[in-house]
Amino acid sequence: MMFSVFAIAGCTPTTLNKEWSYKTSDNELAIGAYIYSLNAAYSQAESFAKKLDDYDSTSDKWLDEKIKDDDGNEQVAREWIKDQAKKMCLSYLVVDEQLKKENVNIGQATLDSATSQAETYWNVGPYASQGYVMPMKKQYEKYGVSLDSFAYCTTLYNTKYEALFKAVYGKGGSKEVSDADLTKYFKENYTDYSYLPVNLYTSTKDEAGSSKNVAMSDKEIKKVEDQLNGYKNDLNKGGSFDDVIASYKKSSGSEKDSSVSNVEVLDKSSIGKELKEAIGKLKTGKAETLKVGSGDSAIYYLVYKKDINKDVDSYIGNESNRAGVLASMKSDEFSKYIDGLAEKLKYEENTSVIDKYKPELFFVAVEPTTAASTTTASDKSSK
């Protein structure tokens, strides 16, 4: 269960850093943690700025213009960036503080694993196992972020955040969610569905070896539609989806099961809008067919909604699934809880040091030709 793309916090990296950014009575953040957070906030703000009519990738003037974030808040970009960086830093301190108050003990093996993961990201990147070596130290080290600070603001923070979440909402927690409430949420918000996609085109390769899609003839399309509509009728009469798939595999001469089944919150699903709408309209135990796309990219779908009530014991009984349901139910509330604690946190801010780091530090001009040049490429010693 991940709560942020890169958010870590283990032992605060103070011993290797001469400068600090924020601190409480018993905790201190290295300036590198602030720089990392400022960079993360910059990237997010830039994505909002790109929606502006007069956004210019060759200039950093957008930093002095108002942007609108995902919550609809409008603010001058550079101020938004600094505020978000500060908010992130205070969240790091809050999580550490609350772990102590909740008496949460994270095993050393778990912390070591998180640190090791950060080291991997730092040295070879998160996609090295897939053949893409992109060391994250190249992105951060030049700005003054050390491995310690990077780890503090990424994998360790995720580890601690998740541990605190479980301590608060798990069994025996200060805000424990009962099995009854979790089950109620599951039944009301989750959907158990399956669908079978059938391409209305064939794929071939030309003489150069390039793949090319060719739309089926009207006769071929009607054959597919008739077959899937027949399955739909069988399901609507109480038939089994497993039987439908077995029949389709036999008729198509394929041993591969191309159907997809999921139990999830439909609104948060990554499936297409058309599928979401079709599944959302279905009654339990019913099926429907629909066509998505056109020409040489069209797909015909058979969609089916199962009875979510039959999944309670088997789904929530699985520890990993239960954690996922709990996260879906309480993650937004927990985020606001942490934000609220951050607003009440007693801390010191090392303003004279923090003010040395401006949002434009991260600006990279992108010319119309897509050639990039860095405008503020001065390297700094790692913090």
Predicted features, each with a name:
Residues 13-17, 138-222, 270-383:
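PPIase-associated folding chaperone regions across multiple families
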Residues 103-111, 240-247, 289-291, 349:
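Surface-exposed patches in mature extracellular/periplasmic domains of secreted proteins
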Residues 84-89:
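Hydrophobic alpha-helical transmembrane segments
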Residues 27, 34, 39, 198-203, ...:
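Solvent-exposed coil/turn segments that connect beta secondary-structure elements
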Residues 1-79, 83, 343-344, 348-383:
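Short, low-structural-confidence N-terminal segments
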Residues 43-81, 100-183, 215-219, 266-273:
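Charged, solvent-exposed helices and adjacent loops that form client-binding or oligomerization surfaces
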Residues 92, 96-98, 102:
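N-terminal accessory alpha/beta regions
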Residues 226-274, 314:
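Peptidyl-prolyl cis-trans isomerase
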